[in-house]
Amino acid sequence: MQITTPYYIIDEKRLLRNLQIMQQIREQSGAKFVLALKCFSTWAVFDLMRQYMDGTTSSSLYEARLGHEKFGGETHAYCVGYSPEDIHALAGFADKIIFNSISQLDTYYNEVQAKHLGLRINPGFSCSHFDLADPARRYSRLGVVDKEALQAQVSRLSGLMFHYNCEND
């Protein structure tokens, strides 16, 4: 048999073992697991994975649409910067929309206030050696730093996102 490259081989037994571990954690803690489509958007195994996961999270409109249409469950959307068109589309199907800044939240709040909304928080440290994704680097604009400004937004939010472990083995 001739296989044309590139191709991906997925060991379903190993994948299933990891999914079963997640299921145990879900049952014992009440935690939810969402698939980060930026890291793994191989829809060939979505039928298996959706049995063990609660939905997807995405970093673009098209990833969010993929998760909504092909995976199901909860659809979480996050992007460093949204266009008005992206927000309008996401308002139609995303369950949770996470903003990178308070100014984004202010700009789009009226259109999405019926959704679960969140803000990305800059923790001020990072475990990553990848400078572009390091929220603690100088002049970083990855998330909200001002604790007082964040406190003023609490009534509009249903959650926070901490993202500090990108590109870390």
Segments from the language model and where they lie:
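A short, N-terminal amphipathic alpha-helix
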Residues: 18-28, 66
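Active-site-proximal beta-alpha core segment in soluble small-molecule metabolic enzymes
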Residues: 32-169
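Generic N-terminal amphipathic, Lys/Arg-enriched alpha-helix
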Residues: 1-9
